[in-house]
Amino acid sequence: MPVGVEARASWRVVALTLLLLPAVPAASQPLPPRPLQPSMPHVCAEQKLTLVGHRQPCVQAFSRVVPVWRSGCGQQAWCVGQERRTVYYMSYRQVYATEARTVFRCCPGWSQKPGQEGCLSDVDECANANGGCEGPCCNTVGGFYCRCPPGYQLQGDGKTCQDVDECRSHNGGCQHRCVNTPGSYLCECKPGFRLHTDGRTCLAISSCTLGNGGCQHQCVQLTVTQHRCQCRPQYQLQEDGRRCVRRSPCADGNGGCMHTCQELRGLAHCGCHPGYQLAADRKACEDVDECALGLAQCAHGCLNTQGSFKCVCHAGYELGADGRQCYRIEMEIVNSCEAGNGGCSHGCSHTSTGPLCTCPRGYELDEDQKTCIDIDDCANSPCCQQVCANTPGGYECSCFAGYRLNTDGCGCEDVDECASGHSGCEHHCSNLAGSFQCFCEAGYRLDEDRRGCTPLEESVVDLDGQLPFVRPLPHIAVLGDELPQLFQDDYGAEEEAVAELRGEHTLTEKFVCLDHSFGHDCSLTCDDCRNGGTCFPGLDGCDCPEGWTGIICNETCPPDTFGKNCSSPCICQNGGTCDPVSGACRCPPGVSGAHCEDGCPKGFYGKHCRKKCHCANRGRCHRLYGACLCDPGLYGRFCHLACPPWAFGPGCSEDCLCEQSHTRSCNSKDGSCSCKAGFQGERCEAECEPGSFGPGCRNRCTCRPGVACDPVSGECRTQCPPGYQGEDCGQECPVGTFGVNCSGSCSCVGAPCHRVTGECLCPPGKTGEDCGADCPEGRWGLGCQEICPACEHGASCDPETGTCLCLPGFVGSRCQDACPAGWFGTGCQMRCACANDGHCHPATGRCSCAPGWTGLSCQRACDSGHWGPDCIHPCNCSAGHGNCDAVSGLCLCEAGYEGPQCEQWCRQGYFGPGCEQKCRCEHGATCDHVSGACTCPAGWRGSFCEHACPAGFFGLDCGSACNCSAGAPCDAVTGSCICPAGRWGPHCAQTCPPLTFGLNCSQICTCFNGASCDPVLGQCHCAPGWMGPTCLQACPAGLYGKNCQHSCLCRNGGSCDPILGQCTCPEGWTGLACENECLPGHHGAGCRLNCSCLNGGTCDRLTGHCRCPAGWTGDKCQSPCVSGMFGVHCEEHCACRKGATCHHVTGACLCPPGWRGSHCEQACPRGWFGEACAQRCHCPPGASCHHVSGECHCPPGFTGPGCEQACQPGTFGKDCEHPCQCPGETWACHPASGACVCAAGYHGTDCQQRCPSGRYGPGCEQICKCLNGGTCDPATGACYCPAGFLGADCSLACPQGRFGPSCAHVCTCGQGAACDPVSGTCICPPGKTGGHCERGCPQDRFGKGCEHKCACRNGGLCHATNGSCSCPLGWMGPHCEHACPAGRYGAACLLECSCQNNGSCEPTSGACLCGPGFYGQACEDTCPAGFHGSGCQRVCECQQGAPCDPVSGRCLCPAGFRGQFCERGCKPGFFGDGCLQQCNSPTGVPCDPISGLCLCPPGRAGTTCDLDCRRGRFGPGCALRCDCGGGADCDPISGQCHCVDSYTGPTCREVPTQLSSIRPAPQHSSSKAMKH
């Protein structure tokens, strides 16, 4: 080893020793920890790399030319020549390499303290930055771990905590909505529900408590989840069932009116039918006594009736046809109208004074009282609303275009052309008053016909090719109802019925009208027929058209008839009325159908049964008005009004029976009468008895005997002549009294008596001396001389009027008809008050309630526990866990119960109302049959007991903590510790004994080679250098240390020690990590062997083999190249001819004697021979000199100046003078001897055989060297290549693009395609096809030969080469099978959408589809004010200028307003946004609904109105300044000035005249007073 190398090696050893030696501790310091060794506990080995620099030798060389002596220099034996010499020398370079060394450190989680044998102290990793844990950090012996608080779970990094979304599992156990929160969750309920005590179940709450149930006025709770809206008095509910509008005062109980009600300026004004007049209360109607007022004009007697009167005649007389005159029966009547119609132009009536001319309706008598002239009815304010046309004898109403005549014949109503479908509008129709208007959708315009619509972009084409013209606007057509076919009955029968109904009486002598007149007084002619009526053929009456009746067709059909002569009966039901012409039914609100057969269902009313009513206790509402049916004595929208005067009972539908003139008031509940002074009796019908007076006749008179007292005041009367009374005796005795002082009482049983004698004057219907007896059965009238009609249904004849007195429940002239539905009582005048489908008795009106209802008016729903009609059946839900259906009686069980009588809990696994909800409890938990709440068994928790107890807890509700060591879990039910593998003992406090492991330490360890056993899993902890389950395997190559976990640092194929990791280097390498190559001259393992190469050969550092320089060979490079070879590895062949050898190094030819040239191919020049042609010939002139030997003649077979040329074929011998004698071309002669031998390419005894394939040359001894199927010339060995190849030995394939013999043809294949070098056939690449690969694959094919089918979907394009899919816009995936995910669009979904405000983008173009409330290219704009919804198309309906939410349209009310549309102000006492803030004002003081400031009343001020106005201020809030002069103060409330110092006037600035000269007093005292 050279000295330098040895020195460097020694230095490295010293350096390594210094590194390994521990520092010597000072005597004053404590001993440091002992150096760590691999055998110490918790010590881990590590590899540490260091960078080491050293000098590396390298061999260099240079060349130079030096003079050398050479021998054989021609004439001289030696001469000096030039020779190139190479000099080799050694140099050094500085190189750096990394060296690895093993160091020992404490394993992670351990540390070494002074004096410890190894690493025995645990490191508390949690003390430093909490160990990196996000949650709690738990230190363990030799390590640590992170935990998370409840509601969080540990992430994969073992440190980060992530919130657990409990709502993802079973909705968190929540019945309605689960809301996740950090570390926990909570349950929420839908509107109308509240959270149960279990925190999960939702219970229904009163729906009225949420926003007043949406009601504008009042919310009435019906059930827990149902309510109805109710309006304040004078308001009615709209169709939406929430808002209220002011209702007509006539809508409630007919406005309190007995007969008719008319609304004027918001107030109800009552009216009465003919024959009645308003009572003093301006509501009730009382009969007009036409007899008493002299309006009857009866000839004999007058009998007053309800609403009318009737004339009666004395005995022996009979009532005339006019109903007033009386005629003796035996008197012959002379008809004054018989001659010339009495001179009348129209009607003539015979009277006792002569003919009386009358005119038909629409005419009036002229001044001659004979002639009838037409009345211009249109000039006298007719009922026509729009157009009036006067006609002879009448007038006709009509309407403008677009209107049609109402059924009353007067009013006009607009024709809704749009609703009838006759508008002809193509798109939209808008009805106008009297007309309509068509309009088109966006993007269209109205055609010239004003009906059709044409797109804006379309041009108008003149279809008929004529000039354009302007079309007039269409006239608006009035649509009339089509008249059905009319029915015609026998007119005679109808006339008889009419006559019977009129009750006319004819004389015994029947007379016949003459001169084509008719009527009861023969005063009518055919000219009197009205309303289109025509005369009968006999000219004896009018034939009326449809809808008219009467003797001259001047009366519309009665309500229950229609058609011609009113002969067809109406078939309208439920109170519907029929058109008198067509018979079409007009249904009242709440009823529908062609015949009004469809009434409104319960809870609805109105014309189309669309209005919703909400009556208390499920009460039924009036089908017309929606009003609730009230208890007796009450009426009105909310039954809050007392009955009007003289009405009582349910719905105030019964009339009081009191004598109103004698009565103070009538009880509204039971109809009892309170009498005025002077009257008594149940109906106050009787005056006080003589000797009593006053209210109820309870006071006794104090007059002397024989003197009567006033029954009202009790005053005593004076003595008057019989039949008279009064202070001046000018008054006749009142009815019922007679005699002196009218003291006698008539004993005429209510009939009047003669005022003087007391003789009874019996009224009609009475007879006898005291008029106490009624007329005999079948007789009536004065003197009981009239015969009663045939009354039906047990009715009797009124002895006074002769009318049939119908029993309650019947009506009609003969009581032949039962009361119509909804009416009862005497005369069917009382309206039934039965609600909710109840039926009333036609006589008594008593309600028979439908199932589920009870009460006098069936307005009260069945009480709990009863059901059926009138609620008479008791419920049989005896278990007490339910009620029964009020209609069917079926038990409606409470939540959690079922069975016919609700006696059973829900079957196992079900709960709730109807036991229809399925329990979701798990792990054997019991389910509450009412709420579904789970009661978990021990060891389980959660809403559905789906979670086991968390680690460390057990028992019921997991409320007990486990007492187990080492983090061992415990049994969730019993709490007993379940020791993990490796632990044992009652509390798992002990680790397994040595050589045992697993659960209960029951398994035996199987570890070898000094390994220890893991007490938990039994895994072997191998000693360094070993691995495997049982530590039987040594570390594999490249690994070392404990568990073979360290990677060796050995390089260049070096192997390391499996325990310590030290490197063992392979041949050719050295160093700590085998990173250094062997130095020159050294080789083998560790470079310890020396090389012995000669002749400049170099040594291989791995094998030691010599790498020889050019020209040398052998193990040690000791031998030159063999003859004919030269160069590196002696692999090059010499190119020398004539048997010359070449230089073994350079390859230069060493020519034999006689030859020269670079390849020794030339003979010596003439005159020269021998080696290097250096010798001159000495032959005679002209003689040849042999170029080798110098002889002066050529040897046989050669010729030429230098004998260098062989004999020509066919010659031989010396100087080639002899001709060959060999037969044929297959023979050749030897050039020297002439012997015949086979020619090149032939062989055999007769030289006739060609050389076999693969051989050539003389005797076929040479082997052909042609490749790739090439053939060789049998004579010369030249190769003939097949198609596709070329070259001397056919070793080269045709270059690309060529083919065929000698590669002469050019390929014609397409780009990228190859062609067969032999045939030129095109070999197509994948994706191409065709003879020249000129075509691509079809669209659905790909690959080589287009053999494979594409799998692209959704219009994707397939790559023809490899089948990969190119997806269209909006699709992605290997096969374009996935649409772009949300937020992406375009090609391969690579573009990111730019839509804002949660707008979604169209996956193809990226166009934004905006959600409700936004618009714009990127949905960046919020809907403009007043619009909301999708596309901002919906208009906000907010009032008070309030904006609306652009998304939902919800009105954002300003301060001071509330309601769905901000239509309501704050309730008194509330203010601010949403009217949620309560005013801080005293009771009765309102506050500003916006600011909440108190609105102080006049005279008060301050924030709470607790201060009086300061002087000089008055009014509300003391905001006004007083305007008082003369030092006067003003009233703080009204501002009125209180004058002082004689000042007067409204502002105290006027001085009286008498004081004007008096000088006013100085004002300083007043100033002092003011100042004081």
Curated annotation (Swiss-Prot):
Keywords: Calcium, Disulfide bond, EGF-like domain, Glycoprotein, Repeat, Secreted, Signal. Residues 122-162, 163-203, 287-327, 414-454, 518-554, 562-597, 605-640, 785-816, 829-859, 867-903, 911-946, 997-1032, 1040-1075, 1083-1118, 1131-1161, 1169-1204, 1256-1291, 1299-1334, 1342-1377, 1390-1420, 1428-1463 form the EGF-like domain. GO terms for cellular component: collagen-containing extracellular matrix; extracellular region. Residues 1-26 form the signal peptide. The keyword Glycoprotein applies. It comes from the Eukaryota. PROSITE patterns: ASX_HYDROXYL, EGF_1, EGF_2, EGF_3, EGF_CA, EMI. Glycans are attached at N1000. Pfam families: cEGF, EGF_2, EGF_CA, EGF_laminin, FXa_inhibition, hEGF. One of its GO terms (molecular function) is calcium ion binding. Disulfide bonds join C44-C107, C73-C79, C106-C119, C126-C137, C133-C146, C148-C161, C167-C178, C174-C187, C189-C202, C291-C302, C298-C311, C313-C326, C418-C429, C425-C438, C440-C453, C522-C535, C529-C542, C544-C553, C566-C578, C572-C585, C587-C596, C609-C621, C615-C628, C630-C639, C788-C797, C791-C804, C806-C815, C832-C840, C834-C847, C849-C858, C871-C884, C875-C891, C893-C902, C915-C927, C921-C934, C936-C945, C1001-C1013, C1007-C1020, C1022-C1031, C1044-C1056, C1050-C1063, C1065-C1074, C1087-C1099, C1093-C1106, C1108-C1117, C1134-C1142, C1136-C1149, C1151-C1160, C1173-C1185, C1177-C1192, C1194-C1203, C1260-C1272, C1266-C1279, C1281-C1290, C1303-C1315, C1309-C1322, C1324-C1333, C1346-C1358, C1352-C1365, C1367-C1376, C1393-C1401, C1395-C1408, C1410-C1419, C1432-C1444, C1438-C1451, C1453-C1462. This is Multiple epidermal growth factor-like domains protein 6.
